[in-house]
């Protein structure tokens, strides 16, 4: 696996740095100091998923179904269905540099600690980038 040349601190990355990452294909990783925020948010989401209190999008339906509480044994399926409902797109694929930058932007966004993902998701996405495994992303969708 390739090693990164520098760390990104979520919320502190300049536009110039993003442009450099896009144009030069430089590898970057999230600063490990972000892990505490990510872990704290993941614990909150895990507690909400198993708790009795309805939390929108975690253990309730979406949109008009927001008032529908999902049973604890169906929460994982709800989240899987949400991902599958967004797995469609049309148009030509974006170029690889744009797709790579989008992955970096997503990793940086997740590392801010507001999404509730676990740190392992961020590490896995970084590993994929380091190995040159870039998704095909359609222009729309």
Predicted regions and their residues:
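Conserved, well-structured ligand/cofactor-binding cores
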Residues: 1-141
């Amino acid at each position: 696996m390739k090693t990164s040349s520098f760390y990104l601190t979520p919320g502190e990355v300049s536009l110039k740095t993003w442009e450099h990452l896009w144009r030069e294909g430089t590898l970057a990783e999230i600063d490990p100091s972000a892990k505490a925020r990510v872990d704290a948010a993941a614990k909150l989401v895990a507690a909400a998923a198993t708790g009795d209190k309805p939390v929108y999008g975690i253990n309730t339906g979406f949109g008009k179904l927001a008032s529908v509480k999902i049973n604890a044994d169906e929460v994982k399926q709800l989240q899987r269905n949400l991902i599958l409902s967004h797995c469609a797109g049309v148009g030509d694929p974006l170029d690889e540099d744009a797709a790579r930058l989008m992955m970096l932007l997503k990793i940086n966004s997740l590392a801010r600690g507001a999404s509730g993902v676990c740190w392992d998701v961020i590490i896995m996405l970084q590993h994929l980038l380091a190995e040159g495994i870039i998704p095909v992303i359609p222009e729309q969708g």
